[in-house]
Every structure is written in structure tokens, then in C-alpha cells.
Amino acid sequence: MRNTELIEWFRQSAPYVNMHRHKTFVIMLDGNAIAHPNFINITNDISLLHSLGIKLVIVFGARCQIENLLKQNNISSSYHHNIRVTDSNMLEIIKQAVGGLHYDIFSRLSLRLPHSPVLNVVSSNAILAQPLGVIDGVDYGLSGKIRRINIEAIQQQLAQNAIVVIGPIAPSVTGKMFNLAFEEIATQLAIKLKVDKLIAFCDRQGLLDEQGKVISDIHPREAKQHLKKFIQQGDYHHSAARFLQAAIDVCHAGIKRSHLISYQTDGSLLQELFSRDGVGTQLSEASSECIRLATSFDIAGLLNLIRPLEDQGLLVKRSREQLEMEISQYTIIERDGIVIACAALIHYPAEKMAEMACVAVHPDYRDSARGDILLEAIKRRAYKLNIEKLFVLTTQTIQWFQERGFVQIQPTDLPVEKQRHYNYQRMSKVLMLALDN
């Protein structure tokens, strides 16, 4: 990464550093993630999150390690509803696998980066289990489910600046150990702790669309359709499918956001949390992006967006004072607290006309539909004001507006007040759209 790229990334990440500080995240790591060569980088990134003041609970699974140990001991497994039926011999193998991974996680988190503080990593016995029992005539043996979680104990550990690590086995009230699905543990912990995020490291970089591109944001309702496809295609064993169910469940329970990212990609955790669009898939009941009327608090963001375009001569220069006086005219698209697009509606009531002015979209989003979204929002505002004609002045985007129904007119067709201020040196083209009220 060149110095300029590093500086730009660091500047863009600053709002997210403040946004995530003192928040609580549950991180899901399955056995494949822990066994992957990139795991050392994942633990370094987890340490970095902790140093930034983020409270972390790591919930890990051991499915692939358990399978390998069972094969080595010539023990076969049976499943019912994708849950392992566990007997006493298997449980000893499971405890061995889980104990080994516990040690691996602790040792990796103890490998500090140079000059970094010592991490306080603790194991929690806050989970109390009970047997699954008999379902559909199948006795699950020592496979269990959560009976109770001592949330207060975990909160105390987090308050003491500890990273809490929880594995997929837990005792019952009688002291008998049970094998639990770590997805259930992560889901219930996230819900009962009321965390800010659930982050799952999968075998793929989130969910993909029909073109094979990562879906950056998705509503849980749409995510359910992807889950159905996984099940129909027999792909439920993939971690992306199993973790997707957990992400959907916690979103429905009120957790603001869940993320699916790849454990195979170096830096995916940092890119997902500290950049506008991330690298994986974010699930949220409320989108991270919204379109709304601007307020005085948006002026700094507006200036950051339009200044480069003004310097290039694409927009007429506007002072901060002018923006402050005209802020009520602006509609913005905001993403994670950052203004990524804007447009103003300037009303000329005598002629029942209005100008769509200061149209700007951040370079990262110009290939998307943000311009169309802005235009539709401006048209809706215009309808409410009984505006009959919407016009724009442009030097570079003539074709874009023509493709959306605007036709070229003469400056003399503008409202009288606008004609007085028309800049004949700039020679902007004037385009008009008739609005059907």
C-alpha cells in the first residue's frame, strides 16, 4: 500500500474508530477458521480491536477437529437435523478437540505485536447446559442445549477489560458435560448481552448475488431466501449457511448488525469494520444507508463531498456561509454517518419551477444508482410544492439528464430571477423536465 493510500484509508477509518469504541461484539470462529494459516492474522486483528476499546466475546466451534479425531479413533458419527448424536466415547474426543483449540486461541492471542499491551484473555464457564433429550424418536445422548447463561459474570469480565473465550461444551446442574452447537451459544450470547454486532468468520466472503459479487448489505427477510437456497442445494454444512441462520436470528431479536466475512482473507475483519462498504455481507433490519433532508450538522460532510468537484470546475463554488443559509434545500444520502451524495432543490414559486442544483455523488458510488435515487427524492419534494417544471444547469452531465427525460432549453426559458444570475462565461447547458402532478 502506497503512503497516499494508507493515509486515505486511515482518514476514512477514523469515524468508525469512534463509532465502535466501548461497543460489544461477539465473534464466531469455527474449527476451519482456527486451523487456517490466516488465523494468526485474525488474532492480531482481534487484539487491535481490543486495543481500540472494543469489548469482545469469542465463541468457537471445533467441528472439523472433532471429525478428524473421531476418524483417527475409528468412531463414526450420526446426525439428526444437522446435530451430532453424542455418546460418552465421542464426548471424550470432543473434550480433547475443544481443549486443544482453547489452548490455540489463548496462545495466539498471547503472541503480542511489538510494543503492544498484554491482553487479558479469560475462559468463561457462564454457560449451563441441559440434554437435548429425545426428538423424533432419536436420543441425542450427550448433545445438549443452553439452559442458562450467567450474563452478569460475562459482563463483569468484559468490564475488567478481558477478552472472553467460550467453547462448545458446557456442564449441566449435575456436573455432566454436554456437546453444544456453538452457533446456538453465539446467538444466545449476542441476544442476551445485547451486543452491538455479531461477526462470523465463514468459508466464503459473505453472500453472493447472481453475478457472483458479494452482497454488501442485506435485510434479514432477503437473507432468509439465501438460506432456503443453501438448504435446497444441500449446502447447509457450509459455515456461511449455518452462520447466516445465527445472523438472521440475532437481527430479529434486535441486534443492530451482523456480518459474514471470510477467514481466508487477510484483514477482512478490519476492512469490514473500518471502511464504508466493507468486504463481506452485513445484515441489518435498518440499512446503513439512508436518504434524508440535510441539517446544519451535515455541512462539514457536504463540504467534503462537493469541494473536489468545485476544484475541478464541475460545480459552482459555494461558501460555508452559503451552505448554512441554504441547508434546508438539500437532500443527502448518508452511509454510516458519511454524506456520499447530495442535491439541492431551489424553488421559484412564481413560475412553478425549481432547480435541481449542486448534484454530487462520491466517486466510490458513481457507478451505482445513487444519482437516480437523488433525482426521485428531489421529484417527490417538487410534487409536494406543486412544482410543474424541474431544471438543471450542467456542463458535464448533459447526457445523463437527457436519458432521464430532461430536454435542452435556452437560458431565456429560465425563471426571471435565475436569468439574472446565469453565468454566460460558464455557458452551462440548461435542461428541463416537465413534472406530471
Curated annotation (Swiss-Prot):
Transmembrane segments: none annotated. GO terms for biological process: L-arginine biosynthetic process. Its EC number is 2.3.1.1. It catalyses: L-glutamate + acetyl-CoA = N-acetyl-L-glutamate + CoA + H(+). One of its GO terms (cellular component) is cytoplasm. The keyword Transmembrane does not apply. InterPro entries: AceGlu_kinase-like_sf, Acyl_CoA_acyltransferase, Asp/Glu/Uridylate_kinase, GNAT_dom, NAGS_kin, NH2A_AcTrfase. Keywords: Acyltransferase, Amino-acid biosynthesis, Arginine biosynthesis, Cytoplasm, Transferase. It is found in: Cytoplasm. It is an enzyme of class 2 (transferase). Residues 289-437 form the N-acetyltransferase domain. One of its GO terms (molecular function) is L-glutamate N-acetyltransferase activity. SUPFAM superfamilies: Acyl-CoA N-acyltransferases (Nat), Carbamate kinase-like. Pathway: Amino-acid biosynthesis; L-arginine biosynthesis; N(2)-acetyl-L-ornithine from L-glutamate: step 1/4. It holds the Pfam family Acetyltransf_1. In bacteria which possess the bifunctional enzyme ornithine acetyltransferase/N-acetylglutamate synthase (ArgJ), ArgA fulfills an anaplerotic role. Belongs to the acetyltransferase family. ArgA subfamily. PANTHER family: AMINO-ACID ACETYLTRANSFERASE, AMINO-ACID ACETYLTRANSFERASE NAGS1, CHLOROPLASTIC-RELATED. This is Amino-acid acetyltransferase. It comes from Haemophilus ducreyi (strain 35000HP / ATCC 700724). The lineage of its organism: Bacteria, Pseudomonadati, Pseudomonadota, Gammaproteobacteria, Pasteurellales.
